[in-house]
Amino acid sequence: MPTADRPVATLTPPTDSTGVALGPMCRFGPADAPRIFEHLLALDADDRLLRFSHGIRNEGIAAYVATLDFTRDHVHGLCTAQGDIVALAHVGVRDGEVDFGLSVTSTYRQRGLGRALFSHVIALARLHDAVRVVCHSVSPAVLHMAAASGFRRPGGSHTAPLTLDLRAESHAGDDAQPCPAPSAVSLAAA
């Protein structure tokens, strides 16, 4: 099982619109809260509705970020070489069940970042020996990825959240890295 000093599973980093690789999938901590806030604040009203399943104002986003529990939950994502968060997943692990929320900056959509986050969430759930992943999203893109990944509605109810039941099995390593602060990121590394 992952620990605070052992990062989580990652995928090959996708590229941005210029073909430059984004940083590796990384886990954010309390020091990254301002960057998380900026990422979520940049979402327009429609994107906020899709991300949070309800309308949310700037004050609500500030309250949400202030209540993130980085020791209990997992907040992972992808950053540009400048350290800007362009894709974010907040993953809660409770009693053998994982739920999550995803967001991708509008200019970085249609590049596989959402799919990378989605796959990362499922890998993280397996790493934590979860028996089920729950998807509460109303986003058509997330619902499409969920259906393609085998998520189903329990009992066929159209109002129930989508769930993916996981088989108990051992899974590969946990190799996400902490995200560097924007000032520590070298533009030459891109």
Q: Where does each model-flagged region fall?
A:
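Conserved GNAT acetyl-CoA-binding A-motif
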Residues: 125-138
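Short, charged/polar, Gly/Pro-enriched secondary-structure boundary elements
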Residues: 168-175
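Conserved catalytic-core motifs of GNAT/GCN5-like acyltransferases
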Residues: 136, 152-167
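Acetyl-CoA-dependent GNAT
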Residues: 42, 49-99
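Short acidic N-proximal helix/loop "leader" segments that mark the beginning
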Residues: 1-19
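Conserved acetyl-CoA-binding loop-helix of GNAT-fold acetyltransferases
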Residues: 104, 110-125, 148
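A short beta-loop-alpha structural element at the N-terminal edge
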Residues: 23-36
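Short, cationic low-complexity segments
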Residues: 175-190
